[in-house]
Design a protein with these regions (language model features):
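Parallel beta-helix/beta-solenoid repeats that form elongated, surface-exposed shafts/blades used
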Residues: 48-49, 67
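Active-site-adjacent substrate-recognition loops and nearby beta-strands
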Residues: 8-19, 35-47
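Active-site-adjacent helical/loop segments in soluble small-molecule enzymes
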Residues: 56
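Structured segments of extracytoplasmic/periplasmic soluble domains
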Residues: 28-32, 59, 85-88
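Residues that recognize and position ribonucleotide moieties
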Residues: 49-50, 75
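Periplasmic N-terminal gating module of Gram-negative TonB-dependent outer-membrane receptors
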Residues: 19-31
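C-terminal intramolecular chaperone/auto-processing assembly modules
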Residues: 1-3, 10-22, 63-112
Length: 112
């Protein structure tokens, strides 16, 4: 059995210490052009849905080039966007609770 030292290190080589602003990424996702397209070698009936790699590279500056979108980058952008949406949803839920309480209080005052 090979030792751990013989195994290639597949982990991140240089993790970033720069924080990611999920709300900024979410805004970038919202502005990213999404279209249907196909590769040149595919039959005309074949369609894919998503951003063009060039737009992706310009928007996020991720990956090796502007001709492909790495799944790891797409997953990361998706997950941080979901986190931002989850946070926004929580804020909106709290606001709805507060507004309902205010409405009940106002309704109670006017029904007296």
């Amino acid at each position: 059995m090979p030792s751990q030292a013989d195994q290639p290190d597949l982990g991140p080589v240089a993790p970033s210490d720069r924080p990611i602003n999920g709300f900024q990424v979410l805004e970038q996702v919202a502005g990213l052009p999404i279209s249907t397209w196909r590769y040149r070698w595919e039959e005309p009936r074949v369609r894919h849905l998503g951003p063009m790699a060039q737009d992706w590279a310009t928007t996020f500056g991720l990956g090796e080039n502007d001709t492909t979108i790495a799944a790891v980058d797409a997953n990361g952008v998706t997950l941080v966007s979901i986190q931002a949406l989850y946070h926004l949803l929580g804020e909106l839920r709290n606001e709805v609770v507060e507004l309902r309480q205010q409405l009940r209080a106002l309704t109670a005052k006017t029904n007296k």
